[in-house]
Amino acid sequence: MGQKVHPTGFRLGILKSWDSRWFATKDYAKLVHEDRKIRDYIKARLYHAGIAKVEIERAANKVKIRIFTARPGIVIGKKGAEIETLRRDLERKFKREILIDIQEVRRPELDATLVGENISLQLVRRVAFRRAMKRAVSAALKFGAKGVRVASAGRLGGAEMARREWYREGRVPLHTLRADIDYGTAIARTTYGAIGVKVWIFKGEVLP
């Protein structure tokens, strides 16, 4: 059975960069765990803001967090009130000086993580999984994607036995290193159980 390597990890240092950028000697594991906790906290708190990615940079006791969001207005809040509250809460929780930078995701239809979350939201609302997948794929292609592949696994449509279904349009060359492929996952927690959603979006080849 063919296994898929993680498309982002496969291209690290070639087309993709790391989401955590810092250097550590003895506290490495502790800081990796802290990064994970920061990401989980931000994604849970700003769930409705469409968080695509959270990048973290560290220097001494300072942590710079860059949040990529489809709805910056929700994150920033009125006169920056929401972002200031978030910064203070993070400082209190992690005992470090926190700087937050907000970046807008201009085309959320081409962000694999946001597409996956959109599909999972539709599955929770009991939209037919094939319709949800096809709608997301056609929207991404309309906004300029060269190819899209979506896979869903679990008790699809409330079926007794779990299964995996996928849908693809265009080409998604997973083994071509110069191919710019965005990959994202999401989990739809339905009344029948969890359904995993994976999305691959091919945006074109980046020539050296």
From Swiss-Prot:
Part of the 30S ribosomal subunit. Forms a tight complex with proteins S10 and S14. This is Small ribosomal subunit protein uS3. Residues 38-106 form the KH type-2 domain. The keyword Manganese does not apply. GO terms for biological process: translation. Gene3D superfamilies: 3.30.300.20, Ribosomal protein S3, C-terminal domain. GO terms for molecular function: mRNA binding; rRNA binding; structural constituent of ribosome. Belongs to the universal ribosomal protein uS3 family. InterPro entries: KH_dom, KH_dom-like_a/b, KH_dom_type_2, KH_sf_prok-type, Ribosomal_S3_C_sf, Ribosomal_uS3_bac-typ, Ribosomal_uS3_C, Ribosomal_uS3_CS. Keywords: Ribonucleoprotein, Ribosomal protein, RNA-binding, rRNA-binding. Signal peptide: none annotated. One of its GO terms (cellular component) is cytosolic small ribosomal subunit. It comes from Syntrophobacter fumaroxidans (strain DSM 10017 / MPOB). Binds the lower part of the 30S subunit head. Binds mRNA in the 70S ribosome, positioning it for translation.
